[in-house]
Regions:
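Alpha-helical transmembrane segments of multi-pass small-molecule/ion transporters
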Residues: 1-315
Length: 315
């Protein structure tokens, strides 16, 4: 294993610590990451390019072998998290800008970190990759449509413009990554070795930019937003697990869909908020806090399931 690979793996495994550190720096020195703001869409594009670079045709085999599990996962992703976000916003009577931010992250597809957490939890990694990939590829259509339906009454939303943003920031970079992988083949291995490092660097810069731009609102409403994020994430895990259980999927798929549903592509949420709600930077805060929290909670949940699996294997 190369030094770059070792460093990259270490950074990837300690992501939550780096996210919390950069959020703290941005809070106490908000101008530190001010320069990052205009580059948020590009940073997300780099992350999505990395996702495309690692995808293989075999990653979609499960879509044909076990379509039921993938379909249930994708439906659960785009039903549970948006609905939960909307209900939390209404039940807690959240201010419009915060409510829109919570709903926005709820309407995003699953996050790529869910694949790692599924592996650690001894879930079905192939299913995790397929659900993440499919939900991401159809997000240009579903994310703006569901977001408009649930949050259109709260703030003015340009769904068509948002669709184009997702195509540019998500779909195009993924397709480009697939093409590069197809053309270069094994030569992309050195690039993929650095992906955890590059992805973590990109997302912590996005977090820093969002937190720095919203310091005032975080002081005013940070505890409320964090509480909603924790509830949103936790309910996602719970309902994702039972969605798989109630539809007769095996235990490894139940763990997988719990993680898939509960963990969001919060980087996309932050990028969309920065691009379409620049006048209300607090809209991006739920996504930024989600980025920090879901990696902590996902690690804890994966560790619990891994320990449980090890215990059951002992004679």
């Amino acid at each position: 294993m190369s030094i770059l690979n070792k460093i990259s793996n270490f950074i990837g495994k300690t992501f939550s610590l780096w996210a919390a550190l950069f959020a703290g720096i941005a809070f106490f020195a908000p101008d530190t990451f001010k320069w990052v703001g205009p580059y948020i869409p590009w940073l997300l594009g780099i992350i999505m390019f990395g996702m495309g670079l690692t995808l293989k045709p075999s990653d979609f085999d499960i879509l044909f072998k076990r379509p039921k599990a993938v379909i249930i996962g994708v439906i659960a992703q785009f039903a549970i998290m948006p609905a939960t976000a909307y209900l939390l916003a209404k039940l807690l009577n959240l201010p419009a800008e915060i409510a829109v931010g919570v709903i926005l992250v709820g309407c995003c597809p699953g996050g790529t970190a869910s694949n790692v957490m599924t592996y650690l939890a001894r879930g079905n990694v192939a299913l995790s990759v397929a659900v993440t990939s499919v939900s991401t590829l159809i997000s240009p259509l579903l994310t703006p449509a569901i977001f408009l339906m649930l949050a259109g009454e709260m703030l003015e939303i340009q769904a068509g413009s948002m669709l184009m943003s997702i195509v540019k920031m998500v779909l195009f970079p993924i397709v480009l990554g697939l093409i590069v992988h197809k053309v270069l083949g094994n030569k992309t291995e050195k690039l993929t070795d650095a992906l955890p490092l590059v992805s973590v660097a990109a997302i912590v810069l996005i977090i820093g930019a969002v937190v720095g731009a919203s310091k005032g609102k975080i002081i005013e409403s940070g505890l409320l937003i964090f509480t909603v994020v924790v509830l949103h994430n936790g309910i996602g895990y719970l309902l994702g697990f039972f969605a798989a259980k109630w539809t007769g999927l095996p235990y490894d798929a139940q763990k997988t869909l719990a993680i898939e549903v509960g963990m969001q592509n919060s980087g996309l949420g932050a990028a969309l908020a920065a691009a379409h709600f620049a006048a209300a930077p607090v809209v991006a805060v739920p996504s930024a806090l989600f980025s920090v929290w879901h990696n902590i909670s996902g690690s804890l949940l994966a560790t619990y399931w891994a320990a449980k699996a090890s215990k059951h294997k002992k004679p």
